[in-house]
A protein has these predicted regions:
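Alpha-helical transmembrane-bundle signature of multi-pass membrane transport and export proteins
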Residues: 1-300
């Protein structure tokens, strides 16, 4: 996303186009995860991960080739991002559904936090490496390196120990989705969690899309600086995950979720008005930390 955002802003010089690209990714993620969750309950999850990871690798390779051949247009990026979100709508609930099957219930919150470390570690290291390499080797090479990063995933999947999948009869998918929504909206706690998550995602994730604008126009830095900005939330996420996993005592889930989402939004306000690079980095570290605490809490 770091490279894609910089590429779009460099091609268009328009924050509006960054918004369009972001919308192309966000739109499928509004509706499709409901179906992704149902699919994850009905199919062999290891097979699903093979399919989704292969799809993401293929899309990454397509974008890398377009950039390398100097054929890339904004609409290409929009299509790739949209299709990537469709794949992620199945991949994400599948990965989340795997975690509870691997650990006892009592360790679930810690397991979710450690699960976040894996992906947050990528969010920490990936953008920084991309920002450092891009000026030296070019955007296309960085995108090809991203494609190569899927290789360890394909090596690890056969080693994943999961309960044996037992095929069985299921009701129609649409009915399952409808029943799931009906169940969710008859539980006050679930409604609150969904609304808080939706609001924080809608208004709190725009900094990721607009990071190239902040980097170049506000903080007066280049793609290397953008890489550090994009890595900062990853560092915070890793710290937050380790804090949850190692804590001997934590407040009740509801209270912890409320404090963390409030702090998350306040840190974002601070980032929005900051014109100091170092302060912006620190605020984004805090954003990543609090977002991980909130996510791990509500999933528990």
């Amino acid at each position: 996303l770091t490279i894609v955002g910089w590429l779009v802003f460099d091609m268009t010089n328009s924050p509006a186009w960054l918004g369009v690209v972001g919308a192309s990714r966000a739109a499928p993620m509004i509706v499709l995860p409901f179906f992704g969750g149902v699919i994850a309950d009905r199919m062999d999850r290891r097979l699903l991960l093979w399919i989704t990871q292969s799809g993401q690798a293929l899309l990454s390779l397509t974008l890398a080739l377009l950039v390398a051949l100097d054929l890339v247009l904004v609409w290409h990026i929009i299509v790739v991002m949209c299709l990537g979100a469709v794949v992620e709508a199945v991949d994400q609930p599948t990965r989340q559904a795997i975690v509870p099957s691997l650990v006892p219930r009592i360790d679930l919150r810690k397991a979710i936090a450690l699960h976040a470390v894996v992906f947050s570690g990528g969010a920490l290291v990936g953008p920084a490496i991309a920002g450092l390499l891009a000026p030296a080797v070019g955007l296309a090479t960085v995108l090809f390196i991203n494609v190569a990063s899927f290789v360890p995933v394909f090596i690890a999947l056969p080693l994943l120990h999961l309960p044996r999948f037992e095929p069985r009869q299921h009701e129609p998918i649409l009915k399952s989705v409808r029943d799931g929504l009906r169940f969710a909206f008859t539980r006050e706690l679930i409604i609150v969690v969904i609304l808080v998550s939706a609001v924080s995602s809608l208004f709190g994730r725009s900094y990721q899309l607009l990071a190239p604008v902040f980097a170049r126009e506000v903080l007066l830095t280049d793609i290397t600086g953008l890489g550090w900005l994009a890595s900062a939330p990853g560092l915070g996420a890793v710290l937050g995950a380790f804090a949850i996993a190692s804590a001997r005592w934590l407040p009740a889930n509801g209270r912890l979720a409320g404090f963390s989402v409030a702090g998350y939004l306040l840190a974002l306000v601070g980032f929005a008005i900051s014109n100091n690079f170092g302060l912006s980095i620190l605020l984004l570290v805090l954003v990543g930390l609090l977002n991980t605490v909130f996510s791990a809490t509500v999933r528990t």
